[in-house]
Amino acid sequence: MDIKGALNRIVNQLDLTTEEMQAVMRQIMTGRCTDAQIGAFLMGMRMKSETIDEIVGAVAVMRELADGVQLPTLKHVVDVVGTGGDGANIFNVSSAASFVVAAAGGKVAKHGNRAVSGKSGSADLLEAAGIYLELTSEQVARCIDTVGVGFMFAQVHHKAMKYAAGPRRELGLRTLFNMLGPLTNPAGVRHQVVGVFTQELCKPLAEVLKRLGSEHVLVVHSRDGLDEFSLAAATHIAELKDGEVREYEVRPEDFGIKSQTLMGLEVDSPQASLELIRDALGRRKTEAGQKAAELIVMNAGPALYAADLATSLHEGIQLAHDALHTGLAREKMDELVAFTAVYREENAQ
């Protein structure tokens, strides 16, 4: 099926099969469609609502065309990632949580990009911290193996995305591609915490990841709108484990953490996000730093559980608390800065 045939189906509110979606996505991602066709396709899909079959097909093609990262093992390797688009403009929680997971003994294959709608994307934050991002796949793999955390810059590993960049930017709306980023980790991780911008996506995306071979995944959305675990409200979870998807909710009090507002955690730049994270992972001199530390723990703990390094969310949160409060997480951030500095010089030659 070509994109014209797909558009004809979509405007009549007819779904595509997985195979049909794969055919259309290959055309888009290999430069065989016009910007007008891509924009119409994305808007049509959004208005119709994407099915699990369609998302599976789109993800499969993006993974196929990605510049992958080969790791010696995927055991205990996890990604903490969100779709973004929650409008909260709080600091980069998932990036900070990645260093806590590494400090607790996990391996993090972090996949991310620059900000699209927010003030600071994961790439913006890490660049502000002095972490070199233009790494080869082999260099990322060494970061993960040696430091315990490596960052895969989406625009480096998904070069075919350039064909959809213009239409996405001009539309200025959430589209299918907002869902695809967290599902197309170049290392092929099978353990993830995926934050989404609406609760309606939790179970469908867990089902998508199940079909694509994931093993232990938490797809989450907080009742206050965050695409991650929140301190201010209950968090809805669709958990994929042992081949089954179940849904439930948790609150901070379930883990001995006090519910509180997120006031003071908003940032207006990558530098502001970095300063708050350094305080949270360090001595926590400010009230905002103390609150940020609790939010980081609330998100790092589930990642340790998804990585099967903890037998429960409660145990994962305790492990994350210990790793943050020993200062090891702050050391992991500094270690990644130093480790990637070598590659900055190497790649410049």
Curated annotation (Swiss-Prot):
Which keywords annotate this record?
Amino-acid biosynthesis, Aromatic amino acid biosynthesis, Glycosyltransferase, Magnesium, Metal-binding, Transferase, Tryptophan biosynthesis
The pathway noted for it is: Amino-acid biosynthesis; L-tryptophan biosynthesis; L-tryptophan from chorismate: step 2/5
Q: Which GO terms describe its biological process?
A: L-tryptophan biosynthetic process
Mind telling me what this protein is named?
Anthranilate phosphoribosyltransferase
- State how it assembles: Homodimer.
Which positions in this protein are listed as binding 5-phospho-alpha-D-ribose 1-diphosphate? Answer: 82, 85-86, 92-95, 110-118, 122
Q: Which gene encodes it?
A: trpD
Which cysteines share a disulfide bond?
none
Binding positions (anthranilate 1): G82, N113
GO MF terms held by the record? anthranilate phosphoribosyltransferase activity; magnesium ion binding
Q: Does the keyword Metal-binding apply?
A: yes
Catalytic EC class = transferase
Tell me its EC number(s), please: 2.4.2.18
Organism annotation: Pseudomonas paraeruginosa (strain DSM 24068 / PA7) (Pseudomonas aeruginosa (strain PA7))
Lineage, top-rank taxon, reads: Bacteria
Q: What positions does the entry give for anthranilate 2 binding?
A: R168
